[in-house]
Amino acid sequence: MPEVKVPELAESITEGTIAEWLKQVGDSVDKGEAIVELETDKVNVEVVSEEAGVLQELLANEGDTVEVGQAIAVVGEGSGNNTSEAPAKQEAPKQETETSTDDKSAQPAEATSNDTDDKSQDNNQRVNATPSARKYAREKGIDLSEIAAASNDVVRKEHVDQSQTQTSTQQQAQPAAKEETKKLTQQNPSKPVIREKMSRRKKTAAKKLLEVSNNTAMLTTFNEIDMTNVMDLRKRKKEQFIKDHDGTKLGFMSFFTKAAVAALKKYPEVNAEIDGDDMITKQYYDIGVAVSTEDGLLVPFVRDCDKKNFAEIEDEIGNLAKKARDKKLGLDDMVNGSFTITNGGIFGSMMSTPIINGSQAAILGMHSIITRPIAIDADTIENRPMMYIALSYDHRIIDGKEAVGFLKTIKELIENPEDLLLES
């Protein structure tokens, strides 16, 4: 019988976790239909069946870690259950038990659910939603069309969960608080704590960050940039740039990205990595831009930055950031980069020592722009908008001289942005 196996995900991803089965044993499956949602350390992916038939066996449970190439389900011939009806029938007794011990109060709620079930299913079919969201909505008896009107996008499982939480908060607040207090009291009467499992993504991130710290000779060097000229140039070019590039705004990230490319060309060791006893120097410039999301920090890559102009870089950064926050990043967006830029300044960070990303040799940290007095010469002090920048690097590949030179190049280019803009 045909087996459903974990597909090749990406070069750096060898395993994942079963987040949710979208189909159950006995359900009919179409060719190309998603049957399971798999969580990796990068993104969540839906695994599809290569054959049409009936899901006959699940070879892994939700929460299990599975490897690339591992069989996780068996699909056989025949026609299976109508999955749009099965979950509703299975959920009914569970809802009765959880919502109330009073049979009289439970009956009206059950009747209401039955009356609206057909209408909700019809509405749900017209909504643009992921398979996991449809399944979850069916189980909870939620109309996806109401959620779609609020989300203005593809409805995902978290949207359904948020909707359910909002409608039931008042009813559940008091019992939930009592239950939480009970758990905390049992653990330690005088010192309350909350214990929860880390997501796979957080566990993987923690593991990789520790590996980087343990397996590299990481060092950080600093410099500062007078942002006066680049801020003035951006202000002068802002409106014209928007007109010339169909509404694209000129931000600071494109300046730093282009400056990083120029510095990487001048100091190729910063664009390298160690592979065993070899050093691999990359001849491409795929720059990662760190994006903060609800799931933590994600680093999608802007490809071929040396071949893109300012507007193209700004567009791609904006698109990748939106995809990251909407949980729509693909694996191709997240792997095989050459260098990373992170901007702690958006959170108010004045200075930091960023940790190198994966197999890369260095990471550039941007920070807050702070106006402070600067000595222009021996007799002149002026208030200038200043930014500290940091380069964390692997000292096994990059010497201190190259690291300092790299940051100095960034500084010179940002402080003389006209040249950078003209070169682009």
UniProtKB/Swiss-Prot annotation:
Q: Where is the composition biased (Low complexity)?
A: 162-176
Gene Ontology MF term list = dihydrolipoyllysine-residue succinyltransferase activity
Q: Which GO terms describe its biological process?
A: L-lysine catabolic process to acetyl-CoA via saccharopine; tricarboxylic acid cycle
InterPro entries, alphabetically?
A: 2-oxoA_DH_lipoyl-BS, 2-oxoacid_dehydrogenase, 2-oxoacid_DH_actylTfrase, Biotin_lipoyl, CAT-like_dom_sf, E3-bd_dom_sf, PSBD, Single_hybrid_motif
Composition bias (Basic and acidic residues) maps to: 91-105
Active-site positions on this chain: 395, 399
UniProt GO cellular component terms: cytosol; oxoglutarate dehydrogenase complex
**Residue numbers carrying N6-lipoyllysine:** 42
Domain (Lipoyl-binding): give its ranges: 1-76
EC code(s) of this entry: 2.3.1.61
What does this protein's record comment on cofactor binding?
Answer: Binds 1 lipoyl cofactor covalently.
Q: Does the keyword Transferase apply?
A: yes
UniProt lists compositionally biased (Polar residues) regions at: 122-131
Per its UniProt entry, which superkingdom is the organism in?
Answer: Bacteria
Q: Which reaction does it catalyse?
A: N(6)-[(R)-dihydrolipoyl]-L-lysyl-[protein] + succinyl-CoA = N(6)-[(R)-S(8)-succinyldihydrolipoyl]-L-lysyl-[protein] + CoA
Q: Which family does it belong to?
A: Belongs to the 2-oxoacid dehydrogenase family.
Q: What's the protein here called?
A: Dihydrolipoyllysine-residue succinyltransferase component of 2-oxoglutarate dehydrogenase complex
The protein's organism comes out as: Staphylococcus saprophyticus subsp. saprophyticus (strain ATCC 15305 / DSM 20229 / NCIMB 8711 / NCTC 7292 / S-41)
List the taxonomic lineage.
Answer: Bacteria, Bacillati, Bacillota, Bacilli, Bacillales
The gene that this protein is the product of is odhB
